[in-house]
Amino acid sequence: MDITELLAFSAKQGASDLHLSAGLPPMIRVDGDVRRINLPPLEHKQVHALIYDIMNDKQRKDFEEFLETDFSFEVPGVARFRVNAFNQNRGAGAVFRTIPSKVLTMEELGMGEVFKRVSDVPRGLVLVTGPTGSGKSTTLAAMLDYLNNTKYHHILTIEDPIEFVHESKKCLVNQREVHRDTLGFSEALRSALREDPDIILVGEMRDLETIRLALTAAETGHLVFGTLHTTSAAKTIDRVVDVFPAEEKAMVRSMLSESLQSVISQTLIKKIGGGRVAAHEIMIGTPAIRNLIREDKVAQMYSAIQTGGSLGMQTLDMCLKGLVAKGLISRENAREKAKIPENF
């Protein structure tokens, strides 16, 4: 079985990931659970050959030098995949994350009107956060697609690697892949300010320099979308501020309070009857929220979100209650993800 057959099988099963690991049969993750494919275990040289076949020379060199590498790979007519190849105690390994070839719209994903309102802001910082595999890329792709269909703007994305490919519809879209089209996030962001973008997507705000440049871009009149691995709006503010040295924290709080438009923290939950659905905590940069950021009163944010329902804000628990009421998720699954489980 070659790699394209394995990937086609994986996509057909609706898997989010295909795992190849020397010494074990191939496995797929479906609806959050890792399951074995009914095939014999793969030897190290088989796994090594499967991943080497789809790498270019630079990726092979990286893999040999650093013992791991990231790249993207497309099976025409099936999907694109984000690949991480690595070594483990039994030999070679690789994980293929499925990137659906079709960008789903906000309507198809069941995203409310508030997401359109957040996308429509002319400038500022919009952060979509959550753990790995929580659907951040899918949410952001839908928001960019909405803008691509409704505005005459220049959208510039900086990703590692490029996940969803956006055609230029009403917007001009330029997508840059780290290590292929640019040396790094901070380098690409620095030159982005001279590339006349209206909207900038920063695939990952990993380090101080990238976060600083994203804040500067938002402050200078661009709409900047970024992602972090935080699990709530309050933790997101802390994470951004904590990256900076003590003497800069007050200045960063001030910058954030002026430029932050929204924080959307999401998680995926198993649906009744199969599949998964996203649950969101949504914080909007209202005057009250901006004040809390400026005065370092992050602990009071949760209650400000609770009382901001009329403005489109919601806590994760409010969202979970709505999903339970619609019959989409079970109380048990809601309880697992809830901030206050006894409410379920």
From Swiss-Prot:
Q: Which UniProt keywords apply?
A: ATP-binding, Cytoplasm, Fimbrium biogenesis, Nucleotide-binding, Transport
Which PROSITE patterns does the entry link to? T2SP_E
Q: What phenotype has been reported when the gene encoding this protein is knocked out? A: Mutants retain surface pili but have lost twitching motility. In a mouse model of acute pneumonia, a decreased colonization of the liver is observed but not of the lung relative to the parental strain.
| Domain remark in the UniProt entry | The N-terminal region is responsible for proper localization to the piliated pole.
User: Its Gene Ontology molecular function terms?
Assistant: ATP binding; ATP hydrolysis activity
Q: Name one GO cellular component term.
A: type IV pilus
Q: Please give the name of this protein.
A: Type IV pilus retractation ATPase PilT
PANTHER family documented for this protein: TWITCHING MOTILITY PROTEIN PILT, TYPE IV PILUS RETRACTATION ATPASE PILT
Q: Which organism is it from?
A: Pseudomonas aeruginosa (strain ATCC 15692 / DSM 22644 / CIP 104116 / JCM 14847 / LMG 12228 / 1C / PRS 101 / PAO1)
Q: Where does ATP bind?
A: 82, 133-138
Phenotype upon changing residue 163 to Q: About 50% loss of ATPase activity and twitching activity
Tell me which family the UniProt entry assigns to this protein.
Answer: Belongs to the GSP E family.
* GO BP, one annotated term: type IV pilus-dependent motility
Which InterPro entries does the annotation name? Answer: AAA+_ATPase, P-loop_NTPase, PilT/PilU, T2SS/T4SS_dom, T4SS_GSP_E_ATPase
Localization, UniProt: Cytoplasm
